[in-house]
């Protein structure tokens, strides 16, 4: 097997993947990802990021693979270098009303609408398309495939984490700064003891069992 043949069997880097998409005629490429689909409290946050073509952000990766300190560091790098960034969110009330999938897509649509540069093409993490007319491609594990999606995953995660830290000051009994709303043992115990607060997702297991107790 020649070195050229070997290249075709190797997974492209995140930057190479985006470059291949741009070579198809899309100059303005946006990556979209979300953070916070699974937690019992707080919003789901989506980010849309347009990076300059060929930018070398070698440390940018799926946000879940990075430490919080590294995410914060890369967040600043992305915000300083991106051509455009949009952040959208759906709060707990919206999630309860229309379900987490539709709330996620609504947040993604909002994030795209807040870009001051309109993208030619959108790469979306996951399997569900955003309800917009812009051409798009969904990619399973897209944050490990596309640099633009990986950047969006970091922006969404850091933005949401900072929101949850701010909620911790308002509702200190739940420990939001530590677990960011996820259903860990300490969080479940706090819900059982204090009942849900206004940012809890009342339709989610782990919360809904205590809604009547809260209302009664």
From Swiss-Prot:
Family matches, as SUPFAM superfamilies: Ribonuclease H-like
CDD domains named in the record: RNase_HII_bacteria_HII_like
GO BP annotations, alphabetical order: DNA replication, removal of RNA primer; mismatch repair
Catalysed reactions listed for this entry: Endonucleolytic cleavage to 5'-phosphomonoester
Location of this chain's protein in the cell: Cytoplasm
Cofactors required: Mn(2+); Mg(2+)
Broadest EC class assigned to this enzyme: hydrolase
Residues in RNase H type-2 domain copies: 27-216
Entry's cofactor comment: Manganese or magnesium. Binds 1 divalent metal ion per monomer in the absence of substrate. May bind a second metal ion after substrate binding.
HAMAP family per UniProt: RNase_HII_B
Function as written in the Swiss-Prot or TrEMBL entry: Endonuclease that specifically degrades the RNA of RNA-DNA hybrids.
Family according to the record: Belongs to the RNase HII family.
Designated name of the protein: Ribonuclease HII
Annotated organism of origin: Geotalea daltonii (strain DSM 22248 / JCM 15807 / FRC-32) (Geobacter daltonii)
Name of the encoding gene: rnhB
């Amino acid at each position: 097997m020649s070195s050229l043949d070997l290249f075709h069997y190797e997974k492209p880097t995140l930057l190479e993947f985006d470059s291949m998409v741009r070579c198809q005629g899309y100059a303005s490429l946006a990556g979209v990802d979300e953070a916070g689909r699974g937690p019992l409290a707080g919003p789901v946050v989506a980010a849309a990021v347009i990076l300059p073509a060929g930018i070398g952000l070698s440390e940018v990766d799926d946000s879940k693979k990075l430490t919080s300190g590294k995410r914060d560091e890369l967040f600043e790098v992305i915000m300083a270098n991106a051509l455009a960034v949009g952040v959208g969110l759906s709060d707990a009330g919206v999630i309860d009303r229309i379900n987490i999938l539709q709330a996620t897509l609504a947040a993604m649509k909002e994030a795209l609408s807040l870009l001051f540069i309109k993208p030619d093409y959108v790469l979306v993490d996951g399997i569900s398309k955003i309800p917009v007319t812009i051409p798009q491609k969904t990619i399973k594990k897209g944050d490990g495939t596309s640099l633009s999606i990986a950047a969006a995953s970091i922006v969404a995660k850091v933005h949401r984490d900072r929101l949850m830290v701010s909620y911790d000051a308002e509702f200190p009994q739940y420990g939001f700064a530590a677990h960011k709303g996820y259903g860990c043992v300490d969080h479940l115990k706090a819900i059982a003891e204090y009942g849900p607060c206004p940012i809890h997702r009342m339709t989610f297991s782990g919360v809904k069992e205590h809604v009547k107790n809260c209302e009664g």
